[in-house]
Each structure stands twice: as structure tokens, then as C-alpha cells.
């Protein structure tokens, strides 16, 4: 979701980097461009009005580090100020209470609240090692109850049943009693999404809040709603205290306004962000890492954590050995790597966390079609065992047979063979330690995608 803003910042940084030093004139011009970039990204005006003077004060008030270029100095200052606006530090869940710890999920209809409830349940089960149960009090939409039941099964967490003949208060009371009897650590309550601020429904929500005494009341906000969500949040806050936020659909091609505005305007932290549709695509929110991502510096820590949590240690060891013996790399290895890439969120998730230069950014500023991986798998699965082990065997007649078997045209099979050879070259470069050449190699693969 930061693509447009990141591109603007990269251009601004490149422009100031060409200057010999920071002067009052080029600082003023740069701040004007940053202001426009933030407003176009739908960042709230009060946030921008605070942000720009803070940068100006830091640039002019601090002695410029002589070892840094103007561009580096600007990045350092802007990253610091962005981190402050985003929340300064990470706020994690505190589940150190007498069980069950109750979490209330509230928000507008269509924000992804039910899916997020299941995602959070799975994250608490896997990361915090807690016994989790979920329930729905959305008696106005039976599909929501069925959806949560199905998702809870996928997330390997328990589901407490409910139906539209019960009142939300009764469901919550019975769910709490059940959670205590069965020694659950955490109870997640998915509430009915609101289309508007309805007094009757808000009072109903307040009753549930007073009965459950939640340790967290998460407002689930859709990133695509933009800063308009702030007004809705303030209305919710009049009835019951919102404690923190989960921002969903941050993988969408939308502006970053809500993420950059919500903490400053509400004084409540963002704790999680939804980065995709899959249950595992919910991440802890780290303000400093998001600031780095916005400035094109990447988020290598999150990428490393993702790899450590989701990729088999045996695969990492095998990949390391493959690099050492890059000449033995074959299509069986490639198929294994494709499956691992899908595990950590796909190509776009990885690229989104890599550091960017303007050149590299231009190569993948538009999302890469994840179906590329599916095509690759289909082609490889249409090869014989000997062809997978010895790709050099794949010539004219074999290509035609693979094309017929996979239903994919020969030019795209040629493209896969070309990419396979590019990957081998990158492995050779990694072994020799050439980082710049590695990035150029990745850049070439991206440019030559299907």
C-alpha cells in the first residue's frame, strides 16, 4: 500500500542527494514536496501540519553530520519523525491476566473483522502458545457465524456456537462460562459490523463490553476506507473505549493515509496489520519498520522473522548447500523453493520488504501476478524425472511435449528455462559475495517475468 508514497520519497531523496549540501532554499523546496506527497497519500491535514515543522526543526536545529550526504541526512530525520507519528514503539498483546483473557473485535461492516478474528486467534495460538476459543455475536448475519466457524477450524482454534435466537448478552455470558470450565486462555468475540452509528446497536455493544470486561477492544479498520475511518472511530469511542487498532487490507493498492494518521489523531496504537487474505497474513505492527518500508529502506527484520517462522529449517539448510553447489541446482530444487515462497506470502510479500532503489522500484512497482508461480509449478510437473534432474535435456521435441502436457505455450517454457539459468547465475554470485550483482540479477528476473 506504500508504493506511491515510497516512489515519491525516492524521487525526493534522489533530488536532494544531487545537492552538495543542505541549504535553507533546498530544505524549503524538499519540505514542500514531502507535504504534497503526504496529502496525496490521504494523510490527515493535522498530521501533515505537525510533521513538516518537526522535520524543519530537526534539519535546521541539529548540526548536520559531516559523514552523511544530504540525502542520507534527510532519510535519517524523516524516518525518525515518521516513526514518532506511527507510534514510536511496538505495542504487543498483554495476555498476563486471569484466564480467559477476553478480546472484543469491533468495526464497520466489510472491514474484514470476522476473518481478522480467526487470524488473530491463530496468531495467539502459534506465537503466544495459548488455548484459544472464538465466538460470534453477529446474530443479524448468519453467514458471519458460519464463516467464523469454518475459519476457526482452519486456524485450529475452538469455536463456541451461537445463533440468531439468542441475544448477544446471552451468547457472551455462556461463552465466558464455557471458556472458564474448559480452561481456555483467550476468548475472542466477533461482534456485528455496523453500517452506520446506530444508537440501539451501540448500546448493545456497550452491554457486551460491560459484561465481558475485555483486556483489548480492537477496532478493525479497512485501509481502503482512508482517513474517513477516523470520524467513525471517534463515534465508537463515545460509547465504549477503543483500546487499539488492527488495519486490514494493507496489501491493497491504496493510499497510506489511515496508517499515518490514526495514532496521531486518536492517541491509540496500531497493534497488527493484515497483509493478505490467508490466515497467517497478520503481522505485528512495528512503527520503525513501517517507516523504513515507506522510505524504500525495506523491512528485512520482518522478512527474516517470516522466513524463520514459516520455512522448514531443513529447507534453509538445503538451500544453503544448494548455493555452495550451485551447479547441481535443478528443477526439483526450484519446485521446492516455489512452494516455500508461497508459504511466506508469495513474491509480492517478499519484494515489498526488500530495500529499493529508484531503478529497482520501477521494475516492480506494480504487483507481480502470483499466478506466475502456479504456471512454473505446472510446467515443472509436466517434465519427466530425468528432465527435472538435467534441464539441459529440454530441447525442441521435449518442449512440445511439456507444452501439450501443461497447456502452456512454448515461449513461456523458454522463459522459465531462461529464469532457471538466471537463478543459477545469482547463486554463483552469492557464493562469490557480489551483492550489487545479485540485485541486478533479481532485477533482470523481474523484468523478464511471464
Swiss-Prot record:
Gene that encodes the chain: ffh
Protein name from the UniProt record: Signal recognition particle protein
Superkingdom of source: Bacteria
Entry-linked InterPro entries: AAA+_ATPase (IPR003593), P-loop_NTPase (IPR027417), Signal_recog_part_SRP54_M_sf (IPR036891), Signal_recog_particl_SRP54_hlx (IPR013822), Signal_recog_particle_SRP54_M (IPR004125), SRP (IPR004780), SRP/SRP_N (IPR036225), SRP54 (IPR022941)
GO molecular function, one term: ATP hydrolysis activity
Single Gene Ontology BP annotation: SRP-dependent cotranslational protein targeting to membrane
Keywords annotated in UniProt: Cytoplasm, GTP-binding, Hydrolase, Nucleotide-binding, Ribonucleoprotein, RNA-binding, Signal recognition particle
CDD domains hit by this protein: SRP_G (cd18539)
NCBIfam families: ffh
This protein's domain notes: Composed of three domains: the N-terminal N domain, which is responsible for interactions with the ribosome, the central G domain, which binds GTP, and the C-terminal M domain, which binds the RNA and the signal sequence of the RNC.
Location(s) in or outside the cell: Cytoplasm
Membrane keyword on record: no
Enzyme class (EC, first level): hydrolase
Catalytic activity of the protein: GTP + H2O = GDP + phosphate + H(+)
Gene Ontology annotations for the cellular component aspect, listed alphabetically: signal recognition particle
Function: Involved in targeting and insertion of nascent membrane proteins into the cytoplasmic membrane. Binds to the hydrophobic signal sequence of the ribosome-nascent chain (RNC) as it emerges from the ribosomes. The SRP-RNC complex is then targeted to the cytoplasmic membrane where it interacts with the SRP receptor FtsY. Interaction with FtsY leads to the transfer of the RNC complex to the Sec translocase for insertion into the membrane, the hydrolysis of GTP by both Ffh and FtsY, and the dissociation of the SRP-FtsY complex into the individual components.
EC number: 3.6.5.4
Family the entry assigns: Belongs to the GTP-binding SRP family. SRP54 subfamily.
PANTHER family, per database record: SIGNAL RECOGNITION PARTICLE 54K PROTEIN SRP54 (PTHR11564), SIGNAL RECOGNITION PARTICLE SUBUNIT SRP54 (PTHR11564:SF5)
Subunit description: Part of the signal recognition particle protein translocation system, which is composed of SRP and FtsY. SRP is a ribonucleoprotein composed of Ffh and a 4.5S RNA molecule.
Chain sites annotated for binding GTP: 107-114, 190-194, 248-251
Amino acid at each position: 500500500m506504500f508504493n506511491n508514497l515510497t516512489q515519491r520519497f525516492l524521487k525526493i531523496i534522489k533530488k536532494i542527494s544531487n545537492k552538495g549540501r543542505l541549504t535553507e532554499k533546498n530544505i524549503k523546496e524538499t519540505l514542500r514536496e514531502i507535504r504534497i506527497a503526504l496529502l496525496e497519500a490521504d494523510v490527515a491535514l493535522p498530521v501533515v501540519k505537525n510533521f513538516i515543522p518537526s522535520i524543519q526543526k530537526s534539519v535546521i536545529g541539529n548540526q548536520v553530520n559531516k559523514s552523511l550526504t544530504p540525502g542520507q541526512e534527510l532519510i535519517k530525520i524523516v524516518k525518525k519523525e515518521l516513526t514518532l507519528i506511527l507510534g514510536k514503539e511496538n505495542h504487543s498483546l498483554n495476555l498476563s491476566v486471569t484466564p480467559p483473557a477476553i478480546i472484543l473485535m469491533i468495526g464497520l461492516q466489510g472491514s474484514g473483522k470476522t476473518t481478522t478474528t480467526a487470524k488473530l486467534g491463530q496468531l495467539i495460538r502459534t506465537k503466544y502458545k495459548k488455548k484459544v476459543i472464538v465466538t460470534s455475536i453477529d446474530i443479524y448475519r448468519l453467514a458471519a457465524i458460519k464463516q467464523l466457524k469454518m475459519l476457526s477450524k482452519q486456524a485450529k482454534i475452538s469455536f463456541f456456537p451461537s445463533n440468531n435466537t439468542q441475544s448477544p448478552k446471552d451468547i457472551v455470558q455462556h461463552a465466558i462460562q464455557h471458556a472458564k470450565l474448559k480452561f481456555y486462555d483467550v476468548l475472542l468475540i466477533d461482534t456485528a459490523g455496523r453500517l452506520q452509528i446506530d444508537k440501539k446497536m451501540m448500546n448493545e455493544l456497550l452491554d457486551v463490553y460491560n459484561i465481558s470486561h475485555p483486556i483489548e477492544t480492537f477496532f478493525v479498520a479497512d485501509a481502503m476506507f482512508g482517513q474517513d475511518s477516523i470520524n467513525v472511530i471517534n463515534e465508537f469511542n463515545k460509547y465504549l473505549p477503543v483500546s487499539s487498532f488492527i488495519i486490514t487490507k494493507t496489501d491493497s493498492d491504496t493510499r497510506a493515509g489511515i496508517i499515518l494518521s490514526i495514532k496521531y489523531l486518536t492517541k491509540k496504537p496500531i497493534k497488527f496489520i493484515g497483509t493478505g487474505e490467508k490466515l497467517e497474513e497478520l503481522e505485528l505492527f512495528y512503527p520503525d519498520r513501517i517507516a523504513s518500508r515507506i522510505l524504500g529502506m525495506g523491512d528485512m527484520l520482518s522478512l527474516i522473522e517470516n522466513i524463520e517462522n514459516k520455512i522448514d529449517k531443513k529447507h534453509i539448510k538445503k538451500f544453503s548447500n544448494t548455493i555452495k553447489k550451485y551447479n547441481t541446482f535443478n528443477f526439483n530444487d526450484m519446485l521446492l523453493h516455489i512452494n516455500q515462497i508461497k508459504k511466506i506470502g508469495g513474491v509480492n510479500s517478499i519484494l515489498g520488504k526488500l530495500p529499493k532503489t529508484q531503478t529497482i522500484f520501477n521494475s516492480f512497482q506494480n504487483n507481480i501476478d502470483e499466478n506466475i508461480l502456479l504456471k512454473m509449478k505446472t510446467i515443472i510437473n509436466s517434465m519427466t524425472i530425468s528432465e527435472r534432474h538435467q534441464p539441459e535435456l529440454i530441447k525442441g521435441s521435449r518442449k512440445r511435449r511439456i507444452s501439450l502436457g501443461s497447456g502452456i505455450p512454448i515461449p513461456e517454457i523458454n522463459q522459465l528455462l531462461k529464469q532457471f539459468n538466471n537463478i543459477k547465475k545469482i547463486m554463483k554470485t552469492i557464493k562469490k559475495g557480489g551483492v550489487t550483482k545479485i540485485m541486478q540479477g533479481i532485477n533482470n528476473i523481474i523484468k523478464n517475468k511471464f
